[in-house]
């Protein structure tokens, strides 16, 4: 069994876990998440713990660790939630919340409107910051990556949309 799958996932108070065949549903204060688990993984809920083990085989060991990590992210998501911070660096780069989307001005000839999916909300503490929050870690990260993809940070001046904790590797300009 994988090292990750050996550790059980603790179920905190206020979280309800239901298991139907290979579908697991986790309900908490911030919402509920549902995921289909791989058929090579055996999931057992007992004594406020979720245990994952694999059917015999080398490939399935990795699947058990993956399933355990995904279930842990579901439990953390419905209790605490996930957040990604983005910074807009560049002259005239601005962001504001417009309805169910983020209105971005990133130096193009037109403003961009990125629609937010259900389960992800955005807040702009300032014109150059976006904070995305939600219960699904994958979905929050996906939306952040899509917004960053409009204008990724470039290595010469560092302009663009970057994650708050991202270090942009800078290059020196070409010399004559």
Curated annotation (Swiss-Prot):
Keywords: Ribonucleoprotein, Ribosomal protein, RNA-binding, rRNA-binding. One of its GO terms (molecular function) is structural constituent of ribosome. The keyword Cytoplasm does not apply. The keyword Plastid does not apply. It holds the Pfam family Ribosomal_L6. Residues 156-170 have a biased composition (Basic and acidic residues). One of its GO terms (cellular component) is cytosolic large ribosomal subunit. GO terms for biological process: cytoplasmic translation. PROSITE patterns: RIBOSOMAL_L6_1 (PS00525). Residues 156-176 are annotated as: Disordered. SUPFAM superfamilies: Ribosomal protein L6. Belongs to the universal ribosomal protein uL6 family. Part of the 50S ribosomal subunit. This protein binds to the 23S rRNA, and is important in its secondary structure. It is located near the subunit interface in the base of the L7/L12 stalk, and near the tRNA binding site of the peptidyltransferase center. HAMAP family: Ribosomal_uL6_B (MF_01365_B). This is Large ribosomal subunit protein uL6. The gene is rplF.
